[in-house]
Amino acid sequence: GLTGCLSFINLKFKGSKIHSSSSTCEDAINFINVSGQVSNIDVKNAYSDGLDVDFSNVYIDKIKISSAKNDCVDVSFGKYFFKELELFDCGDKALSIGEKSVLKLDKITIDNANIGIASKDSSIALAKIAKLKNLKTCLAAYNKKQEFSGGVIKIKDFECIIYDKKINFDFQSTISINNEL
């Protein structure tokens, strides 16, 4: 069945703005097999995931999620370009990239999550600017499901303050930070 309070399936977006507040579903907003461009996504007080995107190829100008009890943003099986993300008070991962996804992003700001950015299961996350704080783990790349390999994270300009562990990755995965080499 559908997991989103607001689910978009087999659609092409062109400049849409989407807002969700105080959702009570597994995903506040869920995209499945969606393409095109979304101008703005704003989620406040999500019961579980803020934004869940599967099997899609989408460009999103701005995503702002504040207070999601699980992941703020979770993407899988797709190609994604996000221009700006602001993710605050995420119960688990602020940004989770999984299952053979490629995600490119210009700027991400994260404050308060278990894991800042997680790339897993043959996924690649490429970021220009990442400013993170108040995390248990800033960056994590790993293999979770046996049918996939590890995850990759590459960031050009990275800053993480107030954390327990800066990076965590397994033998199948890589994390590369240009301003720290």
Language model region names:
Residues G1-L181:
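Extracellular beta-rich repeat passengers
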